[in-house]
Amino acid sequence: MMVQAGAPQWHVNMQEARQIAQKEHRHILLNFSGSDWCGPCIMLRKEIFDDPGFSAFADSTLVLVNADFPRMKKNQLPKDQQQLNDQLADQYNSKGQFPLTLLLTADGKVLKEWDGNPGVKAADFGAQVKAAIDAEGGH
């Protein structure tokens, strides 16, 4: 199952994302967001993730995963999706930081972490992601 948010494809199931990342030799960018209450999360999506340049970079390099934690009843996620997101939070976001963005290897090892909105232009964020992948010896 995928969620369309602007141009890039965002997965909501980490298992599926890992399978794709392993098959296509990509890294995973995992974003924890509060889409209907977290201002910095909304700005991060608008200023970086929905940027056409970042989208093109992500489409060729990354598998994007979004773990969303909306608060409004009308935006509530299905129970099974809430459980998947809770499991991801237990594993990668135990402090409950929003937004939190992690660059992972295909097998789930954390390479880089951005706590909050990175506060940079989309191209600079893409360069940070690429530098972390290159430093790890990735593609």
Language-model region placement:
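Typically the conserved alpha-helix immediately C-terminal to a functionally engaged Cys/Sec
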Residues: C41-F57
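Non-catalytic, surface beta->alpha helical segment in thiol-disulfide oxidoreductase systems
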Residues: Q91, K95-G137
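Short active-site neighborhood of thiol/selenol oxidoreductases, capturing the structured segment around
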Residues: E24-C38
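Solvent-exposed loop/turn segments at secondary-structure junctions
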Residues: S35-C38, E47-I48, F69-K73, G96, ...
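Thiol-based oxidoreductase modules, predominantly thioredoxin-like and allied folds used
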Residues: P8-H11, F54-Q83
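A short beta-strand-turn-helix
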Residues: W10-I28, A58
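The canonical Cys-X-X-Cys-His
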Residues: C38-I42, T101
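Loop/turn elements at helix/coil->beta-strand transitions in domains of secreted/extracellular proteins
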Residues: E24-I28, S60-N66, Q97-P99, A106-K109
